[in-house]
């Protein structure tokens, strides 16, 4: 898999088209990363939006056409971008309570369930997750894991 940078508008539209409960107006100002397979086909995308400069927080949304788009190295590249390049201290994501696949992915990536917001998506509730920079740094996909692997062979 290959990460694609510099295609934020196009990639944000690609992701938005695959999220059935997405606001039709889109993400607003954002940065996006595409994920291409070995043949160069887009198989997934991640959009960082809702940037709060004062509190250094950002929201993340993602979509995929393949269940195999998240390799360990792809995950590291995607998660390092907001924390290392944008300098955020908190990344959040909101999805529907019945979106078990997304909830499972968020939890596997180290995000913490924060609660349920009522009628976040019009008539549907939303469940909130977050990942803090320190949690990412020490987690399965953070730099502490890479440093440990490099120092142990």
Predicted regions and their residues:
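Conserved glycine-rich acetyl-CoA-binding loop
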Residues: 65-76
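Conserved acetyl-CoA binding element of GNAT-fold acetyltransferases
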Residues: 54-66, 94
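Conserved catalytic-core motifs of GNAT/GCN5-like acyltransferases
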Residues: 112-127
């Amino acid at each position: 898999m290959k990460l694609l940078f510099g295609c934020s508008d196009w990639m944000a539209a690609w992701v938005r088209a695959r999220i059935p409960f997405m606001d039709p107006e889109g993400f607003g100002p954002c940065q996006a990363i595409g994920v291409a397979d070995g043949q160069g086909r887009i198989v997934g995308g991640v959009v960082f939006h809702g940037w709060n400069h004062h509190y250094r927080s950002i929201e993340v949304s993602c979509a995929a056409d393949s269940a195999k788009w998240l390799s360990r190295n792809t995950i590291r590249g995607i998660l390092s971008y907001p924390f290392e390049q944008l300098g955020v201290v908190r990344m959040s994501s909101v999805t529907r309570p019945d979106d078990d696949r997304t909830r499972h992915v968020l939890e596997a990536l180290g995000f913490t369930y924060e609660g349920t917001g009522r009628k976040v998506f019009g008539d549907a509730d939303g469940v909130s997750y977050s990942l803090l920079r320190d949690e990412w740094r020490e987690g399965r996909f953070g730099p502490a894991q890479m440093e440990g692997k490099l120092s142990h062979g």
